[in-house]
Each structure stands twice: as C-alpha cells, then as structure tokens.
C-alpha cells in the first residue's frame, strides 16, 4: 500500500503542459474513478479518489480545461471504509462535461470503454490515460515474487482500452477477471519500471527499482547458500558411505590387503567426514587427493571381487539407509 500512495502522490503533483494529455487524463480519471448518474433528470458526474491531492488536481483541470466547477466532499473513515475518501461531483454541468470528455457519445449514450479520440491519441495521451487510471484505481505492490502494477476497471471495454494504451507505450499488460471484477495487470519488473516512468513517477520508480534489486540480491545469496549447503550434505554423505565401504573392505580382505591400500582405507574409516584432500594431508607421507581416491577405489574393487568369489556381502552392503539418514 505504501508504494501505491507514493506513486499517486508523485503523479498528483506532476506538471503536464500538453492540453490533449491533460484532457486524456481527466477523461481516464473520471472513467475509472466514477460514473454517470441521473439525479432529478440531470446527468451528474462523480469520481471517488483516495488522496486529497488527486481530488484537487482533478477539480483544477476540469475548471481550467472545461470551465466547470466541481465540488469535493470528504467521506470520513468509518465502518467498512478503512480510510478517508474524496468524492468530486459535477452536478449543474454534468451532461456538458460528460459530452466534452467523451463519456457520453453524440447521441447522449454512455461510452463503455474510453472515447475514440483518447484511444487514438498520441503517446503522451496514452501516458495520460494510464496516469488517470492509476490515480483513480491503481495499485503497486512491493517488489517480490508476486509484485504487480494493476488497475481495477469499471468494465471489460475500459480494461481493453487500457491494455491498448500500454501496448502503445511498449508495455505488455493483461486484462483479467478477478472475483468478478475486471483488472489490468503488469507483472514483469522491467515493464513496471517503464510504465512508472511513462506515467511520470520517476522518483518512485527509482525507489522501487532499488528495492527490487536488493530483493534479487538477497534471493540470489539465499539460493547460493542453499546450493552450498546441499553440496556439503552430499559430500558428507558420500564420505560416510565411502568410510563404511572401506571398513567392510578391510574386514573382507583381512591380512591379504596390501599395506598402501590398507593405510588409505584406515584413514577413510578414521576420518569419516574428511574430504579426500584432507585425507591426503593426513597420510604419511602426504599424497594428493587423486592418489587417495585411487587407492580407496582399488581397495573396494579388490574386496568386492573377493566377496563375489566367496559369496559373502560386498562393500555396498555396509551402506544402509539408516547410515545415510544420520549423515
């Protein structure tokens, strides 16, 4: 929620010079935040937002661009309403504003998505469409496995118009129906960053990107730590299994085992969890890990051949599930 407020606060303070972009933002904000109502036979426009800055911006733009006065009502937090809400209302000139913004078509019928002049506008108009939609009903989650930038939409047509505006900006957005409500969602981290900048929330994007990078670094470090732990566990199990086999090999061969193979086997049995390199340093005289491995391999091979001839359990029989479970 904190990131959402940061984005909306930054966008609500953004200065926009283009008249067409300001008009597109107003149309989008009204479409996604409110609706048209018939009150006493007149068309009334209402838009409900969650920040006072947004309400002030919308009221100013409506007056500057269209010359109509809007009234802002404050709804205090109570009951199911967890926070203060601001409702902007245009009553006396509601129909005129609805026609000029394209919320009503030439025949006075409500437009279900966004008006053609907004959908077919320039790149800065597409940015304004997203800015208005986000100010109305957008959210940005913290960077993570399920991070997303999304907008709740008043209907499928509005959602598809928003997807088209994102495509124009080079961003892949998807329209989804979640619990009966239409939403437009952007999940890719790079795409979220691009869209934040396009809307005008560059400062918030930098904060979001920094948090995303920190999280990725932590995730990578955790994966490497888990990988190292797994490797250590595998190495320990292999060493314990080799020690058990070496001990069985010495039992099978008895006095017939050559001295150099016996010494390597005894080292393996005595230092069960040591690496081959460590065993090599413990040998007298010291030897390489390859030499140690070779001697243990020949010891096991010799013992297994003798066990096969005599029909007795070989060295593999010493490696039991219980032994590895305790490793």
From Swiss-Prot:
GO BP of this protein: cell division; regulation of sporulation
The organism's place on the tree of life at top rank: Bacteria
Location of the DNA-binding region in this protein: 275-308
InterPro entries the UniProt entry points to: Homing_endonucl, Sporu_reg_WhiA_N_dom, Sporulation_regulator_WhiA, Sporulation_regulator_WhiA_C, WhiA_LAGLIDADG_dom
Keyword Cell cycle: yes
Presence of the UniProt keyword Coiled coil in the record: no
Single annotated GO MF: DNA binding
Pfam families: HTH_WhiA (PF02650), LAGLIDADG_WhiA (PF14527), WhiA_N (PF10298)
Alphabetical UniProt keywords: Cell cycle, Cell division, DNA-binding
Record function comment: Involved in cell division and chromosome segregation.
Protein family membership: Belongs to the WhiA family.
Matches recorded under HAMAP family: HTH_type_WhiA
NCBIfam families, alphabetized: DNA_bind_WhiA (TIGR00647)
Protein's name according to its UniProt entry: Probable cell division protein WhiA
Organism listed in the record: Mycobacterium leprae (strain TN)
């Amino acid at each position: 929620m904190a990131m959402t407020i940061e984005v909306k606060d930054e966008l609500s303070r953004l200065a926009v010079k283009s008249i067409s972009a300001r008009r597109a933002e107003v149309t989008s904000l009204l479409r996604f935040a409110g609706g048209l109502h018939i009150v006493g036979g007149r068309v009334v426009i209402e838009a409900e937002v969650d920040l006072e800055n947004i309400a002030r911006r919308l009221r100013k733009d409506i007056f500057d661009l269209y010359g109509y006065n809007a009234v802002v009502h404050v709804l205090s937090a109570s009951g199911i309403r967890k926070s203060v809400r601001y409702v902007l209302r245009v009553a006396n000139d509601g129909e005129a504003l609805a026609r000029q913004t394209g919320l009503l078509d030439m025949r006075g019928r409500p437009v279900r998505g966004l008006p053609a002049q907004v959908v077919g506008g320039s790149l800065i108009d597409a940015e304004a469409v997203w800015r208005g939609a986000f100010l109305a009903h957008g959210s940005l989650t913290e960077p993570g496995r399920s991070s997303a930038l999304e907008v709740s939409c008043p209907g499928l047509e509005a959602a598809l118009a928003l997807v088209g505006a994102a495509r124009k900006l080079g961003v892949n957005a998807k329209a989804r129906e979640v619990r009966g409500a239409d939403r437009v969602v952007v999940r890719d981290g790079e795409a979220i960053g691009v869209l934040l900048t396009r809307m005008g929330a560059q400062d918030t994007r930098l904060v979001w990107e920094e948090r995303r990078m920190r999280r990725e670094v932590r995730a990578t470090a955790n994966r490497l730590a888990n990988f190292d732990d797994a490797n250590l566990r595998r190495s320990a199990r292999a060493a314990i299994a080799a020690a058990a086999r070496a001990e069985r090999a010495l039992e099978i061969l008895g006095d017939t085992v050559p001295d150099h193979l016996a010494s390597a086997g005894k080292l393996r049995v005595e230092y069960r969890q040591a690496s081959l390199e460590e065993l090599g340093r413990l040998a007298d005289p010291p030897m390489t890990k390859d030499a140690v491995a070779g001697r243990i391999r020949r010891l096991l091979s010799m013992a297994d051949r003798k066990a096969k001839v005599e029909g007795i359990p070989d060295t593999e029989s010493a490696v039991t599930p219980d032994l590895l479970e305790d490793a």
